[in-house]
């Protein structure tokens, strides 16, 4: 239940327009930084902000850790993601876990599923897909993230481990 409460709070933060370094340009006091760092939302096809697909990502060096969320067929799907930045705008998602869906078949309580999928920033937006020709498909826009939510995510034990390099087999 705690996990779903955090997802709901993150969704509400996107609606409230509270501080984010993407929207405000303020790096704040966060121990993380990088172009991927922040909250990203894709709201195409929905009239309810709570149903927007989203990533909340924290970046330390080339390590990107965060959460993902999407709403489909009347159900909430959420989980965690680890990525490795190859450049300032290109990364590869290497590990994922969460509610069983098209994103993962591994619950977070059971560990991490290894994957190799893109995560890119193009035209100021985040993309987790590539077109057939390899070009970027940017549809997640940067949204404001409340600093207290950033701090809460940083305080999660799994996030502390992730930003410190655990699991260690992630590049």
Show where each model-derived region lies.
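Intrinsically disordered, low-complexity regions
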Residues: 6-9, 61, 156
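A glycine-anchored, Pro-Gly-centered beta-turn/N-cap motif
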Residues: 34-39
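Phosphoinositide-binding peripheral membrane targeting modules
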Residues: 78-80
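Sec-dependent bacterial lipoprotein signal peptides
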Residues: 1-13
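Beta-sheet ligand-binding and adhesion/scaffold domains
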Residues: 22-28, 42-47, 51-56, 84-171
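Bacterial signal peptide processing site
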Residues: 16-19
